[in-house]
């Protein structure tokens, strides 16, 4: 009985909760669904632009992932993978399954080992109505001459960029070639007129025409400025007007026979005034100059040589050189007699000469003594080459020669 009452109370409580207090029906809230484990979503960042890849693309055969726009611009300049440096043969993009994908072959870029493929876009090399095929051929030869492993930049980046932009919109190769040919013809026809080029390309690209033309003109202007900075190629150059014949003819008419006989040329320069290059170089060559140190060393060396000669002459009494000895003067007689009495004839004369040179009272005029016939006494003079004469007192007399050492020889 108790169980029945409790069951009825439970049923009444459920009904009241379902119909509400005032009798309105209130449906029960549905039970929440079971929670699922959410794995973190991995977003691929492009290694080239370091941003989230909007359209994911993979390179074959290395299967590295990049942005589609980034890897397409990269393959325009090099077929090497930015990550592993392997040769990229094609690009996979818009991959839905193993059987649904788009594969774009890579062509027209520089290989890793320095080899170049065929130029992109059928070999177009026309910039603003002028043919640059010869120039592109020369520059490609320069790129091949570089060492292996070097990545050469595209020689005509305007059309490489244009071909890449068209390839992002049109995937069919024949249609892509036709569109590029049409753009080249428009550029050849209208040149640098931006308005006419925009009007001619408007049916093909629609609303994207203005942005495409603006970018195309900017890249073309940069390329043209770069080409103007470079030196002209071997097949190009500046054509100068050669007026040498007309000038020579006019000079021959104006010049008279007298001027021709005098040796005057058409330029007005006389051949008589011309000198050899060696002579003019010798005339303009400056005279050698000695440094002060070398000059002082040379002066000291000359003084030592003079001093040595003076000592030798004093020891031999001037007989070896054939000089006539003379008596010392009154001012220097005391020093000479003192040297002669102290050390004999030979060494005494050397000591006397040294003392005479070291004495500060001797003047430069009195230090220079030369033997003269009038100053020498007849009894002291000795014949040339004979024995030394003796004085009246019988004591030997030494002959002293004084040479001024303060003056240098020229």
Curated annotation (Swiss-Prot):
UniProt keyword list: Activator, DNA-binding, Early protein, Host-virus interaction, Inhibition of host innate immune response by virus, Inhibition of host IRF3 by virus, Inhibition of host mitotic exit by virus, Inhibition of host RLR pathway by virus, Metal-binding, Modulation of host cell cycle by virus, Modulation of host ubiquitin pathway by viral E3 ligase, Modulation of host ubiquitin pathway by virus, Repressor, Transcription, Transcription regulation, Transferase, Ubl conjugation, Viral immunoevasion, Viral latency, Viral reactivation from latency, Zinc, Zinc-finger
EC assignment: 2.3.2.27
Record's compositionally biased regions (Basic residues): 287-315
Feature: compositional bias, Low complexity: 329-340, 348-399
Zinc finger (RING-type): 46-85
Gene Ontology biological-process entries: protein monoubiquitination; protein polyubiquitination; release from viral latency; symbiont-mediated disruption of host cell PML body; symbiont-mediated perturbation of host exit from mitosis; symbiont-mediated perturbation of host ubiquitin-like protein modification; symbiont-mediated suppression of host cytoplasmic pattern recognition receptor signaling pathway via inhibition of IRF3 activity
NADP keyword on record: no
PTM (free text): Auto-ubiquitinated.
Pfam families associated with the record: zf-RING_2
A single MF term (Gene Ontology): ubiquitin protein ligase activity
Region span, Disordered: 243-410
Keyword Zinc applies: yes
Catalytic activity, as annotated: S-ubiquitinyl-[E2 ubiquitin-conjugating enzyme]-L-cysteine + [acceptor protein]-L-lysine = [E2 ubiquitin-conjugating enzyme]-L-cysteine + N(6)-ubiquitinyl-[acceptor protein]-L-lysine
Gene3D superfamilies attached to this UniProt entry: Zinc/RING finger domain, C3HC4 (zinc finger) (3.30.40.10)
Function: Evades nuclear antiviral defenses triggered by dsDNA viruses. Acts during the initial stages of lytic infection and the reactivation of latent viral genome. Prevents the antiviral effect of nuclear bodies by degrading host PML and SP100.
Protein name: E3 ubiquitin-protein ligase ICP0
Species annotation: Suid herpesvirus 1 (strain Indiana-Funkhauser / Becker)
Gene that this polypeptide is encoded by: EP0
């Amino acid at each position: 009985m108790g169980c029945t009452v409790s069951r009825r109370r439970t049923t009444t409580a459920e009904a009241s909760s379902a119909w509400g207090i005032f009798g309105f029906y209130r449906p029960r809230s549905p039970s929440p669904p079971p929670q699922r484990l959410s794995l973190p979503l991995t977003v691929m960042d492009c290694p080239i632009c370091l941003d989230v890849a909007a359209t994911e693309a993979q390179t074959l055969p290395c299967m590295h992932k990049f942005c589609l726009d980034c890897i397409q611009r990269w393959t325009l300049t090099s077929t090497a993978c930015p990550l592993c440096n392997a040769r990229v043969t094609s690009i996979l993009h818009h991959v839905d399954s193993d059987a649904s994908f788009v594969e774009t072959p890579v062509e027209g870029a520089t290989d890793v080992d320095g080899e170049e493929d065929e130029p992109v876009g059928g070999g177009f090399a026309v910039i603003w109505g002028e043919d640059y095929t010869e120039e592109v051929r020369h520059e490609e030869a320069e790129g091949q001459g570089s060492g292996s492993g070097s990545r050469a930049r595209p020689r005509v980046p305007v059309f490489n960029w244009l071909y890449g932009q068209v390839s992002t919109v049109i995937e069919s190769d024949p249609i892509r070639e036709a569109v590029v040919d049409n753009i080249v013809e428009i550029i050849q026809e209208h040149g640098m007129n931006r308005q006419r080029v925009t009007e001619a390309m408007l049916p093909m690209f629609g609303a994207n025409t203005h942005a495409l033309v603006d970018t195309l003109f900017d890249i073309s202007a940069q390329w043209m400025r770069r080409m103007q900075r470079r030196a002209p190629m071997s097949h190009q150059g500046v054509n100068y007007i050669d007026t040498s014949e007309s000038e020579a003819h006019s000079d021959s008419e104006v010049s008279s026979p007298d001027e021709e006989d005098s040796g005057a040329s058409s330029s007005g320069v006389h051949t008589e005034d011309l000198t050899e290059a060696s002579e003019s170089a010798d005339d303009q060559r400056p005279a050698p100059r000695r440094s002060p140190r070398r000059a002082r060393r040379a002066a000291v060396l000359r003084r030592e040589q003079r001093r040595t000669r003076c000592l030798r002459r004093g020891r031999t009494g001037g007989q070896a050189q054939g000089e006539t000895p003379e008596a010392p003067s009154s001012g220097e007689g005391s020093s000479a007699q003192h040297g002669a009495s102290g050390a004999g004839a030979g060494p005494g004369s050397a000591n006397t000469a040294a003392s005479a040179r070291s004495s500060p009272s001797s003047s430069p005029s009195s230090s220079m003594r030369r033997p003269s016939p009038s100053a020498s006494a007849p009894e002291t003079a000795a014949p040339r080459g004979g024995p030394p004469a003796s004085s009246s007192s019988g004591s030997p007399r030494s002959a002293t020669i004084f040479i001024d050492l303060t003056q240098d020889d020229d």
